[in-house]
Amino acid sequence: MLTAQITVEIQGDTHPEAVEAALQGVREAGGTLGRVRAPRLTVNMPASVAAEPVTSAQTVIVPHSVRAGFRGEYRGSVVVLGDVNPGAELIAAGDVIVAGALRGVVHAGYGGTHPDPIVWARPIASAQIRIGDAVARAPEGSSNMRRTDRTERAERAYLQDGMIVIDVQ
């Protein structure tokens, strides 16, 4: 007997009667419909691409979240299509853009060659961010343990008069 909300995944074109039959089966088992969505897609990066060194100041796209222990150095900017979890570190000569929550340590503008580097994430919940030579630390207990809600607005960190400023987008 189901006692929880159920997520139904539908792949491709599906006949409405098939959807109704699935919903009826969930109801008959005592469950309730939580949501209907397409299946989640996992994108695996080929080992040859992951090991390929970046030789120019290009933007690198990381197609997944990064976990604790990951350390990435980039000659240009980096875009992470996921979260940067606590214990992960990103160092970029350019900008650091995170499509999800930023809880790891980042350094944008490393080396001082990129004009006006930024850190952008939804939200910035990191214990420490660095932009150029400036360092910002979160107050004790307010950083990566903060619960993040997917509805949180994006935040942008940038340098202003040599200090890191974070504003809500």
UniProtKB/Swiss-Prot annotation:
- Gene3D superfamilies, sorted: 2.160.20.70
The record's annotation in Pfam families points to: MinC_C
Spans traversing the lipid bilayer: none
Q: What does this protein do?
A: Cell division inhibitor that blocks the formation of polar Z ring septums. Rapidly oscillates between the poles of the cell to destabilize FtsZ filaments that have formed before they mature into polar Z rings. Prevents FtsZ polymerization.
A Gene Ontology biological process in which this protein takes part is: division septum assembly
> Domain of life of the organism in this record?
Bacteria
- What is the protein name stated in its UniProt record? Probable septum site-determining protein MinC
Taxonomic source organism: Deinococcus radiodurans (strain ATCC 13939 / DSM 20539 / JCM 16871 / CCUG 27074 / LMG 4051 / NBRC 15346 / NCIMB 9279 / VKM B-1422 / R1)
| Keywords associated with the record | Cell cycle, Cell division, Septation
Question: How does this chain assemble?
Answer: Interacts with MinD and FtsZ.
| Protein family per UniProt | Belongs to the MinC family.
